[in-house]
Amino acid sequence: MFVPKKSKYKKVFKGRIKGNAKGGSTLSFGDYGLKAMEVGKVQSKHIETARRVISRTLKRSGKVWIRIFPDTPVSKKPADVRMGKGKGSIEFWVFKAKPGRVLFEISSDVPMHLARLALEKATAKLPMKCKFISNHN
């Protein structure tokens, strides 16, 4: 699971995710990628399951880059606890994805149809709509 080693603040406000991605919207390392099409909070477990699906579909050939990291803590109060008494403890970490952000990349060692299949399977594991992109358009 992806968890930051340190963070400046222990707990943060919820906030809102507005607008499109400012950076990270183009392919940098590989030739195929998965781009977010809508707003979503990607948990560390989503990233890990998507990574596993991609590597298993590619049969560990080619290289996979994870372009996101969950750096925002999400707190939650336990069940059957009354209101008040402070904010709950941290349950998990999320990455706040905006539309246009590249989430995963795959190297060009892999055939395009296999890369598309792997990234479409990974899309099913993520909490938002994504699309397949490539440098070969």
Curated annotation (Swiss-Prot):
Q: Which UniProt keywords apply?
A: Ribonucleoprotein, Ribosomal protein, RNA-binding, rRNA-binding, tRNA-binding
Protein family membership? Belongs to the universal ribosomal protein uL16 family.
Q: Which PANTHER family match?
A: 50S/60S RIBOSOMAL PROTEIN L16, LARGE RIBOSOMAL SUBUNIT PROTEIN UL16M
- Pfam families for the chain: Ribosomal_L16 (PF00252)
Give an example GO molecular function.
structural constituent of ribosome
- Report the domain of life of the source organism: Bacteria
Biological process (GO) annotations held by this record are: translation
Q: Does the keyword Ribosomal protein apply?
A: yes
Q: How does it assemble?
A: Part of the 50S ribosomal subunit.
Note whether Ligase occurs among the keywords: no
- What organism does the UniProt record list as the source? Wolbachia pipientis subsp. Culex pipiens (strain wPip)
Query: What is the role of this chain?
Result: Binds 23S rRNA and is also seen to make contacts with the A and possibly P site tRNAs.
Instruction: Report the PROSITE patterns cross-referenced here.
Output: RIBOSOMAL_L16_1, RIBOSOMAL_L16_2
Give a Gene Ontology cellular component term annotated to this protein.
cytosolic large ribosomal subunit
This chain belongs to the protein called Large ribosomal subunit protein uL16
